[in-house]
A protein has these predicted regions:
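Hydrophobic hinge/microswitch elements
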Residues: 82, 86, 146-203
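Beta->alpha turn/N-cap motifs
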Residues: 73-74, 90-96, 119-120, 184-186, ...
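Flexible hinge/capping segments at coil-to-helix
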Residues: 30-31, 103-114, 118-140, 225-228
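Extended ligand-binding regions for polar small-molecule ligands
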Residues: 16-17, 133, 214-247
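Basic, amphipathic "hinge/linker" alpha-helix immediately C-terminal to the N-terminal HTH DNA-binding motif
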Residues: 1-18
Length: 256
C-alpha cells in the first residue's frame, strides 16, 4: 500500500476504535457500570476452562466493572496488546519462552504437558502416554512459521533436544485447520489440553511426558485502573488451586 493509503487506514482505524469505545461507554452507562477491562484470549483455546473462574471471582468483588472478552489469533492478540486495544491477554506458554516481550509482564497461570492429537488408526494409538521420541515416527502437521513462528520453533527445538528433526508434512495457516490435515495414519499435531480440538470425537489425544505447556497471562507495564485487581484475582485463583493440589496429594500435571 502507498503512504497515503497507510495514513488513511490509521485515521479510519482510530475513528473506528473511538466509535467502539463510545458505544461501550454508553452500554456501561445504561447497565450501571463505570469501567471496563478488555481481555484477549486465543481463538483456538477452550478459554472458558480457565477464564470463567477468573471472571466469576472478579465480578463477585467488582460488580460494577465490566469485562470485555474477545478471541483472536496469537499474532492479533500480540498486536492489540501492544497498541493498547487490549489490557491483558492469555496466550500459550511457548510465546513467553520464544518471543521477546520487552515492556510487558508475564505470568504462568495454567500448567499442563503437551498433547499429541492423532487419527484413530495411528500405529501408536494404544499408547496412553507418549514420549517425545515417539514423534520421530510421525508426520507432523504444523502451523506456518509465517503466521506463528513461536509454535514452529518450539516443536523443532523440542525434537532436536531428543536427537531428531521433525518430519514436517504440512504447514497449516492456523491452529483450527490442523485437525483437517490429518490425512494419513501417521499424521499428528501437537497442542495441549486447552486446545479446542483436545478431546474431540474426531481425534485421539495423548499427553507427552516430560514436556511443559500451559497458559500465560501477559500485560503491559502501563497499568490501567482495575487491571491490578484482575491480576490479583487470577493469582489468588492459582494459589487456591495449588493449595488444593497439595492437600489432595496431586502433583502438577507436567510432572505426570
Amino acid at each position: 500500500p502507498t503512504e497515503a493509503a497507510k495514513n488513511l487506514y490509521q485515521v479510519w482505524k482510530k475513528m473506528i476504535v473511538e466509535m467502539q469505545e463510545a458505544v461501550e461507554d454508553a452500554r456501561r452507562y445504561m447497565g450501571g457500570r463505570s469501567e471496563s477491562l478488555k481481555i484477549g484470549v486465543l481463538d483456538s483455546h477452550k478459554s472458558e476452562s480457565y477464564l470463567w473462574e477468573y471472571v466469576e471471582a472478579f465480578h463477585d468483588l467488582y460488580p460494577d466493572i465490566s469485562l470485555a472478552v474477545e478471541s483472536e489469533r496469537p499474532e492479533v492478540l500480540h498486536k492489540k496488546l501492544m497498541e493498547n486495544e487490549l489490557d491483558v491477554i492469555f496466550t500459550v506458554r511457548y510465546d513467553m519462552e520464544t518471543i521477546s516481550w520487552t515492556g510487558h509482564h508475564m505470568e504462568l497461570v495454567k500448567e499442563t504437558p503437551f498433547t499429541v492429537c492423532m487419527r484413530a488408526d495411528n500405529p501408536l494409538v494404544d499408547k496412553q502416554v507418549w514420549e517425545v521420541k515417539d514423534l520421530k515416527e510421525c508426520n507432523l502437521v504444523m502451523i506456518s512459521a509465517l503466521h506463528l513462528p513461536s509454535y514452529n520453533s518450539m516443536i523443532v527445538e523440542l525434537c532436536l533436544k531428543y536427537g531428531f528433526f521433525p518430519n514436517i508434512v504440512y504447514n497449516a495457516q492456523n491452529a483450527a485447520s490442523q485437525i483437517y490435515n490429518l490425512l494419513k495414519e501417521n499424521d499428528v499435531f501437537i497442542c495441549d489440553k486447552y486446545h479446542k480440538d483436545y478431546g474431540s470425537s474426531h481425534v485421539i489425544s495423548r499427553p507427552i511426558k516430560n514436556t511443559k505447556s500451559g497458559v500465560v497471562m501477559v500485560w503491559k507495564n502501563e497499568r490501567k485502573k482495575y487491571l491490578c485487581q484482575f491480576i490479583d484475582v487470577v493469582r489468588n485463583c492459582r494459589q487456591h488451586e495449588q493449595q488444593e493440589n497439595i492437600q489432595n496429594g496431586r502433583m502438577p500435571e507436567e510432572e505426570k
